[in-house]
Amino acid sequence: MGAVPGVVLLLMLAVLGIRAAPAPEECHKLTKPVLKADVQNVSGDWVLVWSVANTTERWICENLTSSYVEFKLHSDIIEYTERNLFLGNSCISFYSNLSASTEKQQQFSLNNLQMEEKGVVRPFNDNGTVKFFETCVDCLSMEYSGDIGRFLLIYRRDGVHQNVEVLKAARDESQKLAECLGFSIDEPFIYDGVSDFCHKKSPEECHKLTKPVTKADVQSVSGDWVLVWSVAENISTSNEWTKLKSSHVELRIHSGVIVLNERNMLKNNSCMTFKTNMTAGPESQNTFIYTSGKMEENGVDKELDENGTVKFFETCADCLSIDYSGLFGHVLFVYRRDGVHQNVEVLKAAQDESQKLAECLGFSIGEPFIYDGVSDFCHKKSSPEVKPEQD
């Protein structure tokens, strides 16, 4: 019998639900790795939306309902936190540092991998390596290879992970990448778009509150801001800078760089000033990074070799919220634009919304800082003095 014409073969494959294997040139495009020199692009918070594994450790894949990953850059190290929620609301977290030697290296090694389950942290002995692939805007793919097997993990940036139709349309591309990397497609994990995470919820209300400001729209954060509400985690209460009376922040945009000048007045009327520059990668990126800063206290300048990440949220007109993660811990700052920061009743009414945002971001609400509406700032009074009328 003669050869089956190509068109007929394609029609047969379509009827049978079988997809042709991706062409080599398509694989070359899909498997372009992220180098160490460009690793800033992976920084941020990510939600697992699709995954396939060739492993003997099936417990890692079975009964998974959600997986949330944070990548934080610290000098040449990527700090990696993965939180996995399983059926029955049990959580297993993994912590590690990823490193690569040269700027052109595309493979990252895992160091000091640890697993936490039911509050108990123990070493997880697996010699693993990771490769990253950027397959679309706000997408990240990660190939993990170790003693326990191989995993392909497809992520969407937190905040754009809930559109089920978009995720469904992207599955074919995910399967192509898996085939290009030599994975056998068995029963992939597929995120349902609504399941919560170990450390925070993923409801529609949170989706609205936690819509981040991207680099393309960062001009909107420019201006002078007054801190009106704040909550912190993993932070030492003995730090003097936590004993706030008022905090005034100036944000200026210069060619894509955010210049921050923060003046904190403490309860003993001493002042502490912090200055830094923040940058982001692509226009769509919503995580801003700084690698150094300068702190001034009692007239003494101190260089801070600190790596931190910041996300901005615009929750209302003349409002700005900042989610900070870094050396000082994890802090949510809620601001009002200078000039509309003194109406105590309005600020009090907005506290419930601030608390909702904090809960959506995974904060446990302890004793928040609440601005009293009248305290002065380091460099100026909270409101201009009223001059007496002239006769």
Swiss-Prot record:
Glycans are attached at N41, N54, N63, N97, N234, N268, N277, N307. CDD domains: lipocalin_ApoM_AGP (cd19415). Residues 1-20 form the signal peptide. It is found in: Secreted. One of its GO terms (cellular component) is extracellular region. Glycosylated. Its main location: secreted. The keyword Glycoprotein applies. Keywords: Glycoprotein, Repeat, Secreted, Signal. Homodimer or heterodimer of PSTBP1 and PSTBP2. Binds both saxitoxin and tetradotoxin. May play a role in toxin accumulation and/or excretion. This is Saxitoxin and tetrodotoxin-binding protein 2. It comes from Takifugu pardalis.
